[in-house]
UniProtKB/Swiss-Prot annotation:
5-phospho-alpha-D-ribose 1-diphosphate binds at residues 81, 84-85, 89, 91-94, 109-117, 121. This is Anthranilate phosphoribosyltransferase. One of its GO terms (biological process) is L-tryptophan biosynthetic process. Pathway: Amino-acid biosynthesis; L-tryptophan biosynthesis; L-tryptophan from chorismate: step 2/5. GO terms for cellular component: cytosol. Belongs to the anthranilate phosphoribosyltransferase family. Anthranilate 1 binds at residues 81, 112. GO terms for molecular function: anthranilate phosphoribosyltransferase activity; magnesium ion binding. Keywords: Amino-acid biosynthesis, Aromatic amino acid biosynthesis, Glycosyltransferase, Magnesium, Metal-binding, Transferase, Tryptophan biosynthesis. Binds 2 magnesium ions per monomer. NCBIfam families: trpD (TIGR01245). Homodimer.
Length: 338
């Protein structure tokens, strides 16, 4: 099937959902060669992926994933980004996840090691003492104990190994950069999802709706795959099956502007120190952007009527020590070392 799909996509023809799902199933089952996968991904990138294609790819990846047994998704939130923005910031969405959890929002964060950055979410969590390699049958236990669980993507998507060589060798962004945040095996009902290009906010929000998400904000701000404090943020929000687009500015919520340079990170130990400082209540640009993103996650989780209310809950989560306590609980629940 993939050979026929390469020919169709190379001529500019969109794939049907069945065709797209079939190609991804071939890739996930090791039935396509690296050359075929690389050719397909490159042709698809040149044509441009449709919402229907991306949704079909995501469904096929989810079908090939290691299952996680949890109750119905409900208000569980994932704070995740595509990466690839090249900004080299500290792990903002990971910090926001602990703040949201401290405000009472169950968080199932899907992530990986650094690919386009020096420090991915798994890297910084390990530096903080979290054991990221918990088996699928313990995710529910960890979530109940800590209010937050981390799902290390390679442990749940082993079939991705078949695409690894092709992705490395072609060296360009492909649809797989989008699929990671769309394939959380724990079935989060709400997503705060950052993308590396503002043009992706609307289509990715539509994909999430197609995949059954209840709530989502797909965001890109000032060159970051986050809600930004350095400038306006483009948002596509999914709610009630409808997607609306708008621009927001941190100053609307009383959050001061700051430069991207003030948010620069480094390796795992450096980023862990920054994250710990934020969770311990340190003031400054790092806290400000975490409050903004955590406020959105809390809003998506149903604990606030809007981002402003979410930010108020986020401030309480930090100032009461609840966010830091969620980190402590996660370390204990995963058997890590503080």
């Amino acid at each position: 099937m993939i050979r026929e799909a390469i020919a169709r996509v190379s001529s500019g023809t969109d794939l049907t959902p069945a065709e797209a799902g079939g190609v991804m199933a071939e890739i996930m089952h090791g039935a396509a060669t690296p050359a075929q996968i690389g050719g397909f991904l490159t042709a698809l990138r040149m044509k441009g992926e449709t919402v229907a294609e991306i949704a079909a790819f995501a469904r096929a990846m989810r079908a090939a994933a290691v299952p996680v047994a949890l109750p119905a998704p409900g208000a569980r939130v994932d704070t995740c980004g595509t990466g690839g923005d090249g900004a080299g910031t500290f792990n903002i969405s990971t910090a926001a996840a602990f703040v949201a959890a401290g405000a009472g929002v169950p968080v199932v964060k899907h992530g990986n090691r650094g690919v386009s950055s020096r420090c991915g979410s798994a890297d910084v969590l390990e530096a903080l003492g979290v054991s990221v390699a918990i088996p699928p049958d313990r995710v529910g236990e960890v979530l109940a104990a800590a209010g937050i669980a981390f799902l290390f993507a390679p442990a749940y998507h082993p079939a991705m190994q078949y695409a690894r060589i092709a992705r490395q060798e072609i060296g360009i962004r492909t649809v797989f950069n989008l699929l990671g945040p769309l394939t959380n095996p724990a079935g989060a009902g709400a997503h705060l999802l950052g993308v590396y290009d503002p043009c992706l906010t609307l289509p990715v929000a539509r994909v999430l709706g197609d995949l059954g998400a209840e709530r989502a904000m797909v965001v890109h701000g000032a060159g970051l795959d986050e809600i930004a404090t350095a400038g306006p943020t483009t948002v596509a929000e999914l709610r009630g099956g409808e997607v609306t687009t708008y621009t927001l500015d941190c100053t609307e919520f009383g959050v001061p502007r700051s430069s991207v340079a003030a948010l620069r990170g480094g390796g795992p130990e450096e980023n862990a120190a920054t994250l710990l400082a934020v969770l311990a209540g340190e003031e400054g640009p790092a806290r400000d952007i975490v409050l903004l993103n955590a406020g959105a996650a809390i809003y998506l989780g149903g604990k606030a009527d809007g981002i402003a209310g979410g930010i108020a809950h986020a401030e309480a989560s930090l100032d009461s020590g609840a966010a830091l306590d969620r980190l402590r609980r996660l370390v204990e629940a995963t058997g890590g070392a503080a």
